[in-house]
Curated annotation (Swiss-Prot):
The gene is rnhA. PROSITE patterns: RNASE_H_1. It catalyses: Endonucleolytic cleavage to 5'-phosphomonoester. It is an enzyme of class 3 (hydrolase). The keyword Hydrolase applies. It comes from the Bacteria. SUPFAM superfamilies: Ribonuclease H-like (SSF53098). Binds 1 Mg(2+) ion per subunit. May bind a second metal ion at a regulatory site, or after substrate binding. It is found in: Cytoplasm. GO terms for cellular component: cytoplasm. This is Ribonuclease H. GO terms for molecular function: magnesium ion binding; nucleic acid binding; RNA-DNA hybrid ribonuclease activity.
């Protein structure tokens, strides 16, 4: 049986950095759509971007082929370029400092390993329908305490 083809759009937002933050993921499968979002206090934009991706992937019950869209180069470069070096270096950066948001990166690495993911970067606020909607949901999460 072939894997299901899924599209996920994610976004994170912060009111102040650090400050109250929101995250959102839009999961698209055939004609099905699921929106998830949440809020955290005293967080950062990067933590919210990572949380959005993690929670979007956790919704999936089976191993899938995923096109995952993020407007965060931090997330895209982290998962596609930096993470293997961090793991080889004991979760240290090239400057020998601990990786920021290490626990979230470890969790993302774990949930991402269950799927085939094509990581795609989309420019924020460029008119991409689902990126704009994910942004709106993440911002709504901050307000809807």
């Amino acid at each position: 049986m072939s894997k299901k083809e899924v599209i996920i759009y994610t976004d994170g937002a912060c009111s102040g950095n650090p400050g109250a933050g929101g995250w959102a993921a839009i999961i698209l499968f055939q004609d099905y759509r699921k929106d998830i979002y949440g809020r955290e206090e005293n967080t950062t934009n990067n933590k919210m971007e990572l949380t959005a991706v993690i929670n979007g992937l956790k919704v999936l019950k089976f191993s899938c082929n995923i096109n995952l869209y993020t407007d965060s180069l931090y997330v895209k470069h982290g998962i596609t370029e930096w993470i293997n070096k961090w793991k080889m270096n004991g979760w240290k950066t090239s400057n020998k400092k601990s990786v920021k948001n290490m626990e979230l990166w470890k969790e993302l690495d774990n949930v991402a390993s269950q799927h085939e993911i094509d990581w795609k970067w989309v420019k924020a606020h460029s008119g991409d329908k689902y990126n704009e909607e994910a942004d709106s949901l993440a911002r709504k999460a901050i307000i809807d305490a």
